[in-house]
Amino acid sequence: MKKKIKIFIDGACLGNPGPGGYGVIICGKKLYKEISNGYYLTTNNRMEIMAAIIALESLHDMYNIIINTDSKYLKNGITKWIKVWKNNKWKTNNNKSVKNIDLWIKLEYLSKKHFINWNWIKGHTNNIKHDRCDFLAKISAKNPNAIDKIYQKIKNF
């Protein structure tokens, strides 16, 4: 039987685009881990997806996971839209290129290693762990130390 854990994630951006960050909390039996980082120039949606990627990359075993996010973009993207996008050769229903393809591909790959229940939670409603992720994401956005190379390449920075 796979071990059970809960993951809380959040992304933030000071301006959109602008400096951004993510916050992650992973918790289970005998496990509590916080992860955060900030980027000089990115978007809020990229930070939401990045939070999920970083959380999954930090796991070394297979898990039964509940990922809690306040991003409907992330939840719907990975549970519904990605199938349509792939069938449409990474085009939306309006025939536009899907944004953040690099991150969606990576997230889908990492997600296949676990059984994941993607849970949407309303943000800023006194959920202690999610509020902590929000804090970590905002602090990281205020103190960036990394470059979102793909985003900056797309935007020609």
From Swiss-Prot:
UniProt domain RNase H type-1: residue ranges: 1-142
A single GO cellular-component term on record: cytoplasm
Catalytic activity: Endonucleolytic cleavage to 5'-phosphomonoester
PANTHER family reported in the protein's UniProt record: RIBONUCLEASE H1
BP-aspect Gene Ontology terms: DNA replication, removal of RNA primer
One example GO MF annotation: RNA-DNA hybrid ribonuclease activity
Residue numbers binding Mg(2+) 1: D10, E48, D70
Cofactors (names): Mg(2+)
Note on how the cofactor is bound: Binds 1 Mg(2+) ion per subunit. May bind a second metal ion at a regulatory site, or after substrate binding.
Protein name per Swiss-Prot or TrEMBL: Ribonuclease H
Subunit structure as annotated in this protein's UniProt entry: Monomer.
Functional summary from the UniProt entry: Endonuclease that specifically degrades the RNA of RNA-DNA hybrids.
Species for this entry: Wigglesworthia glossinidia brevipalpis
Protein location: Cytoplasm
Record InterPro entries: RNase_H, RNaseH-like_sf, RNaseH_domain, RNaseH_sf, RNaseHI
Record-linked Pfam families: RNase_H
Binding site for Mg(2+) 2: D10, D134
